[in-house]
A protein has these predicted regions:
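Bacterial N-terminal signal peptides that target proteins for export
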Residues: 3-23
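Extended, polar beta-sheet/loop recognition surfaces of beta-rich domains
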Residues: 46-57, 132-135, 153, 165-204, ...
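Contiguous beta-strand segments within globular domains
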Residues: 87-104
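Solvent-exposed loop/turn segments flanking beta-strands in beta-repeat/beta-sandwich domains
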Residues: 105-116, 120-124
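Solvent-exposed serine/threonine-rich low-complexity stretches and specific carbohydrate-binding patches
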Residues: 124-138
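Signal that preferentially marks extracellular ectodomain short beta-strand elements
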Residues: 139-153
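Internal, hydrophobic beta-strand segments that form the core of beta-sheet-rich folds
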Residues: 153-166, 223
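Alpha-helical protein-protein interaction scaffolds
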Residues: 195-256
Length: 256
């Protein structure tokens, strides 16, 4: 039993203002069907996401897993919940240890190894997490840990999330890749210092993050609000709007 399956870390995010029990690697309460329903509803954009252009020379990355074969076929539509900006899978965060979100198109089990890595400009590992998790198809949250280091303000990093899905070929995997940059947290002002943030204030903070192009905090708040009140139409529309503006197309329930 490894680190990620041997304990559950519970933390209350002051920023999100919603008490959420996070496992180290947390399947979220958005199943494949629910995720697709949210994303494909026809709504107006309630939050404006204005991303900063990616660093010149940033690799394009890969938002969708792509074609594969064998046991990996069911995971080929693995999708990173990260924007594609000017053709580059690119995001910004204010956190030294941001959470990443992925749509996993098929069930995960303890027998399916996963790996998430973040590397600096010299290819040194800042984050390297190898784990497994029992989770249905749907949205998966991957919080990062500080075992090797943290993201530095002003620096850009490459990341890769991989599912090693073919036991007959241990090196075979389906992967998504991109670039993340840490920026200063001036956008949040004094709000982030409050230990109790009402939903209306959270939504305003979400709007601030989105307008500054700070993806990880914006999408994290949007998902948390939707989880806390799944029948709230505004939260549904906001989540859909962010996916649409970021160029994220969810995988279908059926592998093509």
């Amino acid at each position: 039993m490894n680190l990620y399956t041997s304990f559950v870390t519970k933390r209350v995010s002051r920023l999100l203002g919603v008490a959420i029990a996070w496992s180290a690697i947390a399947p979220l309460a958005l199943s494949q069907a629910a995720f697709s329903q949210v994303v494909f509803s026809q709504v107006e954009q309630t939050v404006q996401f204005l991303p900063t252009p990616p660093d010149q020379g940033s690799p394009d990355g890969r938002q969708r897993g792509g074609a594969t074969r064998g046991d990996c076929l069911e995971y080929q539509e693995l999708t990173a919940i990260v924007p594609k900006v000017d053709g580059v899978v690119w995001s910004q965060t204010t956190s030294a240890l941001p959470t990443f979100f992925f749509q996993v198109p098929a069930e995960l089990t303890e027998e399916v190894p996963l790996e998430f890595v973040i590397q600096d400009s010299n290819d040194a590992y800042v984050v390297r997490q190898q784990f497994s998790v029992d989770a249905e198809a749907g949205l998966l949250a991957v919080p990062t840990t500080a075992e090797l280091g943290e993201l530095t303000v002003g620096e850009s990093y490459s990341w890769t999330f991989s599912i090693y899905c073919d036991e007959t070929r241990p090196s075979a995997s389906v992967s998504v890749t991109g670039t993340v940059q840490r920026v200063g947290d001036e956008v949040v002002g004094s709000v982030a210092d409050s230990s109790e943030i009402l939903p209306a204030e959270q939504f305003r903070l979400l709007q601030q993050y989105a307008s500054e192009g700070i993806w990880h905090e914006a999408i994290g708040i949007a998902i948390a609000l939707h989880q806390a009140d799944p029948n709230n139409v505004t939260y549904q529309e906001t989540l859909q709007s962010l996916f649409t503006q970021a160029g994220i197309v969810p995988a279908t329930d059926e592998v093509q």
